[in-house]
Structure formats: C-alpha cells, structure tokens
Amino acid sequence: LSIFILVIAAYTVYLDAQISAKFAGNKWQVPAQIYARPMFLSLKQEISIKEIEEELQLLGYRRVTRADSSGEYQVLRNSIRIQRRKFDFSHGTENLRNIEISFKNARISQIQDLNSRQSINNIYLEPWLVTRLVSSGREDRMLVQINDVPPILTQALVAVEDQNFYQHFGVAPLSILRALMANISAGRTVQGGSTLTQQLVKNLFLTREKSLVRKAKEAMMALIIEVRYSKDVILEAYLNEVFLGQNGDTGVYGFGLASYFYYDRPLNELSIDEIATLVGIIKGPSYYNPRKHPQRALERRNIVLRSMFESNQLSPNEYQDLVTLPIKLASGASLKKGKHPAFMDQVRRELRLVLDNPDIRQSGLKVFTTLDSNAQMKAERAVSEGVAKQEKRIGKSGFEAAMIVT
C-alpha cells in the first residue's frame, strides 16, 4: 500500500509540473493580425457621411435608430453618431467613445464627445482587420480575458455544461456515476460525466481516447488545476480553448474568434440569443453548425435558453421572446482569406525580414500597415464601373483592369 501511495504521489507531482508549465507560459499560438490604416477624421476634412458609413460597415458596425452600445451608429440629416469601440491602437489604448460628427458643405464642421459634451479636433476609427496570418491546417483563436467577457456568456456556459462548476473541485462524482451506469448498460463508453475543468484538461493535455486510465488521469489533473487556480482562471482558459467550428482548413477555437466567425462582431456586442447559439455549438461544432444545419442549431440554442431560464438567468418574458427569434448569421467576411493578395505577400515578406523567429509571428502580434481601405474601396468601384462602361461601349465582355494605389 505504501508503495502504491508513493507512486501516486510521484505521479501527482509529475502532473502538477506539466500543468504549471502550461499555465505559466503561452498556452496557445495566436496568429499575427494584419490591420489596415485606421480612418482619421478631423475638422474641415473633406469627406462624406456615405464614406464614413462604408468604413463603419466594413468594421462590422450596426446601423440603428439610436446608437447606445459599442459598435453601433446612427445617421441623422447632417451628422452621424458613432459608438466608437475600445481599441489598442499603435499609439496606445483608446476607450469606447460616444461621438457625433457634423457636416457642412461636404466637410466635417464639428466632432463632439457626447458624454463630456466637449468638441474635439480629431478622432480615429479602429482599423480594419485585413487578415490573420494562420498557418495552413492550424488552430486559430482570438484570446479574450475573463473581465471582458459578458457575464451572461459564463452564466449560460455553466448552466448548460456544468451546473455545479462553482461547487465542485474539478470532478463531479454524481455525474461520473450516472455516466458509468449508462456505459455499463450500453456495454461501451457512450456518455461522459466531465466537468468544465475536465473538458479543459482533455482539450489542453489529453487525447480523445475513451478509457478508464485516461479518465483517471483527467480527473487527477482536474483536481490539481482546481487546487492551483481560481474558477475565473479556469473559465478564461476554457473560453479560449474550446473548439467551435471550421474555417476552411483552419480550426476556429475560443469564443473570441467564434464571435467574428459567425457574427463579424466582438463578443461583448452579441445579443443573448447569439451567445446561446455559440454555447450550443460546443456539444457538436459540425452537427450544430448554424450555417450548414440551421434547424439543428436553432433547436440546440433553445435548449441552452431553456437551461438559462431554469437557472433564473432569464425571466419568463425574456425566454418566450428569445426562443421565437430566428438564427441570423453574418457572412464571416471579417475572417475571409485571400483579401488583397499582392499587398499581403509584401507584408509577409517584410515580416520575415523583421521578425525571423516564427514563434514571434504566432504570439498574437498586431501589425499596422499603410493599406487605406477607403481609397481601396474607391479604386475598386472606379475600376469596376470603368470596365463596365468600356464593355458596354465596345460590345464585348471579359475585360480585365488593374490599378495601383500610392
């Protein structure tokens, strides 16, 4: 017995070292993010409301009748109101800002901070994310911090995946017992009793093999993690690790990236039904893929909403309203690959020269480029219209054209 205890103790120390090393370092590789030049707006600048609106739409802002939340804007007769998002610019972090830009004679006549009621001389919109430099076949994720995650997301996650998350110490014996009885009844492994912590262990450290030995290791590691780290640290790791879809040959991991993949917006701008849809995907990202199987995704979302209602996170009226909503997805254009290939080839070449260490290029680096998205849109529109006119004038189709923006 003493030898057995010594072996278990030694193995526990070994697992603890593995866990500590993983949590102390960079748990994940995060692709470099390539941004265009941010739109700069200043007094007396010659620009139209339409041009600003085009930029806002490119950035995934939503046009509303009253702009009250981050990522929203409203167009008035001679002005535009914008809830400019918080962003880490190259010159430093700028917080959420509620502004109104007024126009006179096709120029900006005033920029006002609506919270302070003070006029300002200029402001940046956050830059457009052109692409993410993901290696072929790799995981992609956009890391989030627990303090930036909407509380309703963690509440929904716990309600659906692990209702006793805040009470247990990494394993839930009753859940394991229920799963064990189901497996014995079926004569094979058909059900798991994993907590969120065990799911995190499985994703970070283990294979998907279903065996008692692996399950025992999973439970031991879950207990160690619970002793070493707070519930918030565990939740944050889970939110960034979980698999939520496939973008071509690249895996979509974590809620931060999934928010853009399915809705083209940051996580803190999603509605409750959209958050419930993402939580529902966890059970089977392929089976509940809302693009390929919208009805399945809808039914699964409503199960999540039901769990939230039963956990007193939603009122009866909120629940009834939310389950009637259809699933509406964005195009996922913000993560579309192959945008501006010639420009991106040049960016990659310069990055290899400046940053020869590939690990640095996979550390979540933000790269701010000179690409002017506003000029690019004008150029593309001019070329498209010009080619169409020439084809109509000559009576032939299939013309090609090129333009250089300097």
Where are these regions (language model features)?
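Juxtamembrane regions of bacterial inner-membrane/periplasmic proteins
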Residues: 1-394, 403
